């Protein structure tokens, strides 16, 4: 009996829901599938269905932690991504965009690399950038084709004026372009508060005004704007800490197209989590953002979240209910932990492979490769 072959459109409907890590192994199954997995429309559909994972970067290893929330006893799986260049060059994570990691090292002359851990042989090497500290990767989403770039920035103050030096690396030209812009000190001044996330090619982070006004914001770096107009306030946060030092705030992505923000009181350890009601579209100005309370976690034994560099989280809401997944460090013993909260369940899992300081970030694995 000859087996019947499914129509290609039905195969595609099934395959785009398969995790990309599995699809990579299927590339050699047949020529049609290999071609399909390179199709941009298919890649974007698959990315939109992706499940978040947690990336941990130590001085010698990069790990990816997947979380299985499908049953009553959630579990994790730890993978060593085996980035061979990490141990000898001192690379640190500077950003994640479309499942691709941007890492930079100041050792041995300096320089960066962009790579997708699903295609570890394909790496994009970035030349050293002069005189810039903070760097971020993103793309101009206003164009039909994504135009990826890296933006670095450093500032120097003198007699009430600030000179911002911007370094922009265009992937299309494979070169850095440096420009200087002078501005007066702004009052109130927007102060960066916590780590950064990427959405629609732009970079977002929490911030507050100095002098402090009691309000907190999401600030953004818009990769589609002229460089001197790219940094701006996006929207107001629902956070309530009277002083910036009494609470910890961490930003995350929810359902792939919305924001989630966590705020923890350092006194009571209570955690409140909000999510945006509607998706954040490309080109949105933030004026119509509506926040809704997602979850409150009141556990006296919960850790105090101090370092956003090594703390990351994501939330989910499916047929099993609302879930909160947190990765954070402990000092004694020095270790990495994953907390999973769902209803009355609070599960704490130690990551045995990590016994040192680390960076942590949430990302979605993808088939996207940055040229």
Curated annotation (Swiss-Prot):
Every F-box domain range: 1-46
Pfam families named among the record's database cross-references: F-box (PF00646), FBA_1 (PF07734)
Protein name: Putative F-box protein At1g58090
Matches recorded under PROSITE patterns: FBOX
């Amino acid at each position: 009996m000859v087996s019947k072959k499914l129509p290609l459109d039905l195969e595609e409907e099934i395959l785009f829901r398969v995790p990309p890590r599995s699809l990579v192994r299927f590339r050699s199954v047949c020529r049609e599938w290999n071609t399909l997995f390179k199709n941009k429309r298919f890649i974007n559909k698959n990315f939109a269905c992706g499940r978040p994972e947690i990336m941990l970067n130590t001085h010698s290893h990069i790990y990816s932690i997947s979380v299985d929330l499908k049953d009553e006893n959630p579990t994790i799986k730890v993978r060593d991504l085996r980035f061979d260049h990490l141990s000898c060059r001192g690379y640190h994570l500077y950003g994640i965009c479309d499942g691709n990691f941007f890492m930079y090292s100041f050792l041995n002359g300096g320089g960066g690399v962009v790579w997708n851990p699903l295609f570890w042989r394909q790496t994009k090497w970035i030349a050293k950038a002069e005189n810039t500290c903070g760097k971020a990767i993103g793309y101009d989403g206003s164009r039909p084709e994504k135009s990826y770039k890296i933006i670095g920035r450093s500032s120097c103050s003198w007699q009430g004026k600030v000179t911002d030096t911007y370094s922009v690396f265009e992937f299309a030209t494979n070169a850095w372009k440096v420009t200087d812009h002078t501005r007066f000190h702004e009052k109130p001044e927007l102060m960066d508060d916590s780590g950064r996330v990427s959405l629609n090619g732009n970079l977002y982070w929490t911030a507050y005004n100095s002098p402090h006004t009691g309000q907190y914001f999401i600030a953004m770096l818009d990769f589609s704007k002229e460089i001197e107009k790219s940094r701006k306030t996006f929207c107001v946060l629902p956070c309530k800490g009277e002083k910036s030092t009494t609470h910890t705030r961490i930003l995350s992505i929810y359902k792939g197209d919305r924001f989630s923000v966590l705020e923890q009181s350092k006194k009571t350890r209570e955690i409140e989590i909000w999510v945006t009601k509607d998706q954040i579209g490309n080109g949105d100005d933030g004026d119509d953002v509506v926040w809704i309370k997602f979850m409150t976690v009141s556990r006296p034994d919960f850790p105090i979240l101090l370092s956003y560099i090594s703390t990351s989280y994501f939330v989910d809401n499916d047929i099993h209910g609302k879930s909160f997944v947190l990765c954070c460090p402990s000092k004694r013993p020095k270790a990495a932990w994953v907390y999973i909260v769902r209803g009355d369940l609070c599960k704490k899992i130690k990551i045995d492979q990590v016994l040192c300081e680390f960076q942590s970030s949430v990302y979605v694995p993808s088939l996207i490769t940055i040229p």
